[in-house]
């Protein structure tokens, strides 16, 4: 069994325990007794025992405080070597994700059987793609090792940071490595790990079918440049198309014509479906891509409403940056005014994202997804950044990074009733030449806003400070899921995105490299959150729920993306949005900000085992 299969099996089982998949944790017992007839050299090994009419599962587990209470492992710290299944008096050793999926299928409702079969294919794809991407990492080692601060242009720095980020797996979704729908050859041509340029295809669409949100950018081709008669411009509009998406279509709908020639050389970014225009690198174009990632239900097409909702948040956040002293100079937003769509069709749409040169030209833009990426010298990329921008003081960098995230996102939550889905891909840290960090924002089409608090805050600001008229109205939002009727939804998003994805994942990576203990790093995070809550409360803002969720509750909310995105039907999960399906099950690591507290917590879990 190869290393990648073991790696994926570990991630899969840990996620199943974290999300209590099919009751495998809540219906289990824990014991220190090994399966009958099995000799295990590790003393004090804890076994998760799950009884089912068809079998009994014995899974070796260890207690943890990070994202879940138990994970698949051995007490000696070495990688687990499998589990045991007792059937009809016979004990069988297993260790492959295929066997784990077979167990889950036995436990699952019939509505999940097809989903589990599909997920097995995703696992196999992830195993293959990981091997190919690991090869690409070795091949590009010299290129990605060059100091990012020494590159001549901001856009080369961003592309390099995206490429570095692409080699690191998602912290929590087990098969994020799979770009499901891409062949080996497709991966090499179109994935950021390989950093190859390609040309966009174009579709001429009858104007009567098309909606454009503004004028198309200067880099757009003419009809003649893509091999069509010039007078087509009177009746048609050109839409960009990814080669893979165009290839997947059996035929184009009526009113659409594929242009004979390609135009615009582009390079893929971390998201794969968003590409950089090589000759105009401040222009990024997001195009539909027939690819699934972060869940078999997550097809990377473009919902037309996101064009409008993303631009709505761009206008709002840019306005708040200008009018709120706590946000001023701490963030800037890409221009996402332009896009096009054909009715509600998700396959024929695009968004243009323009990076503002006044904010970018003197900076290095780094997605949060790149920070914990391992480099060829076995250090984390964040260590390289600290060396180049923070006089090698990694802890000083971490302090400033946490303070920046907490100040911006807690202000948005508690003052304005806004929570951004600023995941590791969307959250970008911009370093200036002196090392000062700001946040570059984009793609905020799936945020959450509580209109009651938002309206109160903006009206109060206008009365008190004479702030300019608010440029947006909540009634303009198209995706009604964005608007929430209580504060909990904001707290859940802050916890699962900003705190867990953007901060805790970085903490654990730093601790694994012995840069500092996780306890000391969580102490920095807890202190930063406390300072921001005290500041905001001192200004008269309500912090009760935030304190309950972050400073008092023993468990934090966690996102259950494997459940909602891949293994449970919508009827079973009840999730209206697969990216916002939560469980209250992650230990609150903010309360474990000393090594003594961590040890006591783990010992308490062990003592609960009979």
Mark where each language-model region is:
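An amphipathic, hydrophobic-aromatic interaction surface with interspersed Lys/Arg
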Residues: 402-415
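Nucleotide/phosphate-binding site architecture used for ATP/NTP-dependent chemistry
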Residues: 1-404, 431-610
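A short glycine-rich, hydrophobically flanked beta-strand micro-motif that places a catalytic Asp/Glu
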Residues: 416-430
């Amino acid at each position: 069994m190869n290393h990648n299969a073991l790696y994926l099996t570990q991630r899969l089982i840990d996620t199943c325990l974290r999300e209590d998949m099919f009751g495998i944790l809540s219906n289990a017992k824990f014991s220190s007794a090994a399966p009958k007839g099995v000799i295990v050299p590790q003393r004090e090994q804890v076994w998760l025992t799950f009884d089912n009419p068809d079998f009994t599962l014995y899974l070796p587990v260890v207690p943890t405080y990070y994202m879940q209470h138990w994970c698949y492992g051995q007490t000696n710290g070495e990688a687990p070597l499998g589990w045991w299944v007792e059937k009809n008096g016979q004990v069988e050793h297993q260790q492959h994700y295929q066997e784990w999926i077979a167990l889950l299928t036995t436990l699952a409702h019939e509505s999940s059987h097809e989903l589990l079969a599909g997920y097995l294919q995703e696992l196999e794809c992830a195993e293959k793609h990981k091997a190919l991407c690991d090869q690409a990492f070795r091949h590009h080692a010299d290129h990605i090792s060059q100091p990012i601060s020494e590159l001549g242009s901001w856009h080369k720095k961003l592309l390099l940071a995206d490429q570095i980020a692409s080699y690191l797996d998602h912290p929590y979704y087990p098969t994020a490595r799979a770009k499901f729908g891409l062949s080996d050859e497709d991966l090499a041509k179109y994935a950021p790990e390989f950093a190859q340029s390609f040309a966009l295809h174009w579709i001429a669409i009858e104007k009567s079918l098309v909606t454009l949100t503004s004028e198309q950018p200067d880099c757009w081709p003419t009809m003649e440049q893509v091999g069509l008669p010039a007078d087509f411009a009177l009746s048609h509009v050109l839409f960009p198309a990814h080669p893979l998406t165009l290839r997947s279509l059996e035929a184009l709908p009526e009113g659409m014509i594929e242009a004979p020639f390609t135009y615009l050389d582009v390079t893929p970014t971390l998201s794969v479906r968003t590409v950089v225009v090589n000759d105009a690198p401040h222009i990024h174009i997001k195009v539909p891509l027939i690819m699934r990632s972060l869940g078999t239900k997550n097809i990377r097409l473009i919902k037309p409403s996101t064009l409008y909702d993303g631009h709505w948040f761009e206008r709002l956040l840019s306005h708040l940056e200008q009018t709120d002293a706590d946000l001023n100079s701490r963030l800037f937003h890409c221009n996402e005014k332009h896009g096009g769509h054909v009715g509600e069709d998700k396959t024929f749409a695009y968004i243009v994202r323009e990076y503002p040169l006044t904010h970018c030209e003197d900076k290095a833009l780094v997605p949060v997804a790149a920070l914990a990426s391992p480099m060829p010298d076995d250090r984390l990329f964040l260590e390289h950044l600290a060396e180049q921008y923070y006089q090698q003081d990694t802890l000083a960098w971490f302090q400033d990074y946490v303070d920046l995230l907490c100040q911006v996102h807690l202000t948005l939550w508690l003052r304005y009733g806004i929570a951004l889905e600023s995941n590791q891909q969307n959250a970008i840290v911009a370093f200036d030449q002196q090392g000062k960090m700001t946040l570059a924002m984009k793609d905020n089409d799936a945020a959450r806003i509580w209109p009651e608090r938002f309206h109160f805050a903006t009206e109060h600001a206008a009365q008190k400070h004479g702030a300019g008229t608010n440029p947006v109205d909540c009634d303009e939002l198209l995706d009604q899921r964005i608007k929430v009727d209580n504060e909990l939804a904001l707290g859940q998003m802050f916890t699962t995105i900003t705190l867990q994805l953007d901060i805790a994942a970085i903490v654990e990576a730093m601790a694994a490299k012995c840069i500092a203990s996780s306890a000391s790093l969580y102490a920095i995070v807890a202190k930063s959150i406390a300072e921001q809550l005290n500041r905001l409360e001192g200004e008269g803002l309500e912090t009760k729920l935030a304190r309950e969720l972050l400073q008092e509750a023993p468990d934090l909310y966690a996102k259950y993306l494997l459940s909602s995105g891949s293994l449970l039907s919508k009827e079973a999960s009840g999730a209206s949005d697969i990216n916002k399906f939560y469980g209250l099950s992650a230990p609150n690591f903010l309360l474990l900000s000393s090594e003594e507290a961590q040890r006591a917590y783990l010992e308490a879990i062990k003592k609960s085992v009979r």
